[in-house]
């Protein structure tokens, strides 16, 4: 069974962005990975820019994205951007996510949905 999740982040320049991730959203994996590998602002920005993902790896290059997969349109999998972190995450929500992980520019937080 998939543990679906969101990543919502405050980006460089103050904007906020959000993506959906399909697998491995349980805190023992997702929060640990984000805290270990995505605490550099530039890397967090790059993660959001990938768009929706199947899974997130410990390096950007290891993220399995939906982009480029047959039948996937960028319009459907692109990040949602805006000025308010919670509002961006709420707009991007698919409805079946179990967790939301947020980056405020300093640290990661987890919310069970």
Annotated model-derived regions:
Residues 1-26:
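Short, extreme N-terminal segment that most often corresponds to the first beta-strand
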